Design a protein with these regions (language model features):
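Conserved N-terminal beta-strand and adjoining loop/helix that marks the start
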Residues: 1-21, 41-42
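Residues that flank catalytic or metal-binding motifs in active/ligand-binding sites
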Residues: 7, 16, 70, 88, ...
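Beta-strand scaffold of nucleotide-dependent catalytic cores
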Residues: 22-24, 105
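Generic short beta-strand segments
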Residues: 24, 71-76
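A conserved beta-turn-beta hairpin within the catalytic core of GNAT-like acetyltransferases
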Residues: 29-34
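A short gly/proline-enriched turn/hairpin at secondary-structure junctions
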Residues: 36-38
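Unchanged
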Residues: 43-66, 74-129
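Charged phosphate-binding loop/patch that engages nucleotide di/tri-phosphates or the phosphate backbone
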Residues: 126-150
Length: 150
């Protein structure tokens, strides 16, 4: 039987210095490590990816930003507490015109920390970041080419 598809919108949110906002998730389970991801989440019934991106940005950061170009997408299988799904994520660019604005999380998710990451800090970290190619994808975006472009 095919796994249900979980549609997700994610944001590559950049500040005025091109630092990217990532959130550290840690559910406190001993057998799982914490990891960093971009803001975003599952679409609600009838919601577009762009609308979900705006809603998730506000819920997870308290920030508002105009949603820009779609950068890339990815598909993968994921085990959630409710069961296995096939996740389809679409990533959108968004910018804020200040440097490292303060963020506020109002979502019930196990978000433990927000951090604005420079490209050099991302290249140097040993922390787990998803998607795994986020650092190289961000470098491509900052150099002006869409991720995956030849």
């Amino acid at each position: 039987m095919a796994k249900p598809v979980r549609e997700v919108a994610r944001l590559v949110l950049l500040d005025a210095n091109n630092a990217a906002l990532l959130m550290r998730y840690d559910d406190g389970l001993a057998d799982r490590i914490s990891y960093w991801v971009t803001p975003g989440g599952a679409l609600e019934r009838g919601e577009s990816h762009r609308a979900a991106a705006l809603r998730e940005l506000m819920e997870e950061t308290g920030l508002a930003a105009e949603i820009g170009a779609e950068l890339w997408e990815r598909h993968f299988d994921l085990e959630l507490p409710q069961g296995a799904v096939h996740q389809h994520e679409r990533f959108f660019l968004a910018r804020v015109d200040t440097v490292a604005p303060r963020v506020f999380n109002s979502s019930p998710e196990p978000i433990r920390e927000h951090r604005w990451w420079s490209l050099s800090a991302l290249k140097a970290t040993r922390d787990v970041i998803y998607p795994e190619d986020f650092t190289s994808a961000l470098a491509t975006v900052l150099n002006g080419a869409p991720h995956g472009a030849a």
